[in-house]
Amino acid sequence: MAALIYRQLLTNSYTVELSDEIQEIGSTKTQNVTVNPGPFAQTNYAPVNWGPGETNDSTTVEPVLDGPYQPTTFNPPVSYWMLLAPTNAGVVVEGTNNTNRWLATILIEPNVQQVERTYTLFGQQVQVTVSNDSQTKWKFVDLSKQTQDGNYSQHGSLLSTPKLYGVMKHGGKIYTYNGETPNANTGYYSTTNFDTVNMTAYCDFYIIPLAQEAKCTEYINNGLPPIQNTRNIVPVSIVSRNIVYTRAQPNQDIVVSKTSLWKEMQYNRDIVIRFKFANSIIKSGGLGYKWSEVSFKPANYQYTYTRDGEEVTAHTTCSVNGVNDFNYNGGSLPTDFVISKYEVIKENSFVYIDYWDDSQAFRNMVYVRSLAADLNSVMCTGGDYSFALPVGNYPVMTGGAVSLHSAGVTLSTQFTDFVSLNSLRFRFRLSVEEPPFSILRTRVSGLYGLPAAKPNNSQEYYEIAGRFSLISLVPLNDDYQTPIMNSVTVRQDLERQLGELRDEFNNLSQQIAMSQLIDLALLPLDMFSMFSGIKSTIDAAKSMATNVMKRFKKSSLANSVSTLTDSLSDAASSISRSASVRSVSSTASAWTEVSNIASDINVTTSSISTQTSTISRRLRLKEMATQTDGMNFDDISAAVLKTKIDKSTQLNTNTLPEIVTEASEKFIPNRAYRVIKDDEVLEASIDGKYFAYKVETFEEIPFDVQKFADLVTDSPVISAIIDFKTLKNLNDNYGISRQQALNLLRSDPRVLREFINQDNPIIRNRIESLIMQCRL
């Protein structure tokens, strides 16, 4: 019979579920490892900050504090501070270009009255008069001369509690620190050939890049971090800076874990971020002396660069957040210069840069964890923008600078004119830098930040180098790709396809020939014959059947089987405990939920309709379990489904599982079932209608719900294809024999075909009404 397809789906859907569970168990197998952290470990508290774990190192990120290094003579790199950490009084550092600058620094202990001391400077004994009036602070003094035979003069003393000093070669000058901690600041000495100046350090020292000068000043004023002051920090030779380290590859694809369909990939990438700001300058109406707005706006930038010998195409979007609104009002006259609003980004602002490139890391960026990034800082300086007035000198907005420092990374989506891109959003915090900005020929001057007038300063782009690392869940087959759009969009598209397919299915109901339908309903439709009309390859058909089974196991019919199994178990235990009790609840509990509704037949007499309706909803499963020779509702449902599948033009592998499952649940919702005992028939429908009548005369008799419950448990259940009202109408108008009546009651397909071939209007109308109930 055609209903075989539903029984196959019920059986095989649980096979699919079992297979899925076995694969899941295999993929989630774990190994327990016991770690003894020792008696001093803080084992009672979880980490406060959950990080991504190890992030592979790269060449692009410099350490803030590099060292300590042993005393030595070398040529320090330009634009790097030497942070000197002497432990005793005496000569700290000396350096010369051997032309016009000899500079040395000495350290004097606290509480030293004026005294003459001998120091060895550049290999010569030199007498120097020194003093330190401070009772607690050490004193650094610079000794400088401009000729080899000249006398030393003292400059730029620094009173220091931490006993730290700094010197740097930068921009044709030698910079040092002076003043008094904790408010020390920098000064400088001009020199020629500054880049060739060799330094001799007589104490341990550190190297700090100019970009981290604020940190260097913090150390000078407040001391080194506590970990640098332990005996575990051992100075090394300066030549160790030249050791070639084995660094991570610019491109790394690492398989973290793998299952049957998915794998976790860790992607590590060296990246070059190029970005630019965009702005909007709007002029007000009038005589041309007023501007309404100078503001930032998002800017897209596409570029290529080389990574590990491979050309990478990248796309960035730069936007700002937390801007500061300024204005300038030169007066109330129509010819007075006015800017109603101009935006400035400062230390309370953020810059967002969304980055995407065409590498494998961004192909499947949907399910991502352990995202981390290390990026260098970059300084952005403002250029000159002239406000063109009709008459008079142009006001010029000039200057302004900020530094961008990495403050985090998250997932984002970039929207271009043609496509949306899953990307990474790098967040940057800002710090203001020199010079301040001003508007020439106005009173606006000495303000800090980067104004929106000309933020790129005639540069095509700013550039940041860095590295990111992430772990992404991707398909095991590299040819597959997770969808760019989110699941909601995909589901909405599927719902649209299903809606169109439902309309097509419902319209096809009128094209089904009833004689062919009866023949098709008698065929043993299995999954292969059911889906054979769909144009697809064998592999696609197998995949389609699997998808149908996976969807079908979540249907209400499959859920009813699970509930029924529990009910059978409860009924068996109930009957074994009280075998002598024969009530509706104990007898029918195997197939109904009557035990939850009523326990006494006298109390439930008024709710027979409710009881029979509840019983009828379970009789579909009872009928499947006790298959008879008669045709049932599922045979008609499956035959109609097969006919519509063959005729459909919109069916595909995505919609078929939904349609088959919906058909099993929604086709022929108004069903009636009957049981036969001798000459009596008891019939009940899902909508709560019930009848009891004689076979020969179709005379109605009182409906005995107790008897119905007993027969449902012990006798075959039959689909009332031709229901009581149709039978009675047929008998009243045409007259039928007892044998014909029994065959129609048993839903004998041969008798049904005879009536249809004879074009009996009553039977034809009944079958047509069932076909019209096969709607989605």
Swiss-Prot record:
Gene3D superfamilies cross-referenced by the UniProt entry: 1.20.5.170, 2.60.120.200
Residues covered by region (Hydrophobic): 389-409
Recorded coiled-coil stretches: 484-518
Region (Spike body and stalk (antigen domain)): 248-479
Site positions for Binding to sialic acid: 101, 190
Record key words, sorted: Capsid protein, Coiled coil, Disulfide bond, Hemagglutinin, Host cell membrane, Host cytoplasm, Host cytoskeleton, Host endoplasmic reticulum, Host membrane, Host-virus interaction, Membrane, Outer capsid protein, Viral attachment to host cell, Viral penetration into host cytoplasm, Viral penetration via permeabilization of host membrane, Virion, Virus entry into host cell
Region feature (Spike head): 65-224
Motif (KID motif): 644-646
One GO cellular component, as annotated: host cell plasma membrane
Sites marked Cleavage: 231-232, 241-242, 247-248
Placement of sequence motif YGL motif: 448-450
Position of sequence motif DGE motif: 308-310
A GO BP entry: permeabilization of host organelle membrane involved in viral entry into host cell
Record-annotated disulphide pairs: 203-216, 318-380
Region of interest (Spike foot), ranges: 510-776
Comment field (misc): In group A rotaviruses, VP4 defines the P serotype. Some rotavirus strains are neuraminidase-sensitive and require sialic acid to attach to the cell surface. Some rotavirus strains are integrin-dependent. Some rotavirus strains depend on ganglioside for their entry into the host cell. Hsp70 also seems to be involved in the entry of some strains.
Family the UniProt entry places it in: Belongs to the rotavirus VP4 family.
Name of the featured protein: Outer capsid protein VP4
Taxonomic lineage: Viruses, Riboviria, Orthornavirae, Duplornaviricota, Resentoviricetes
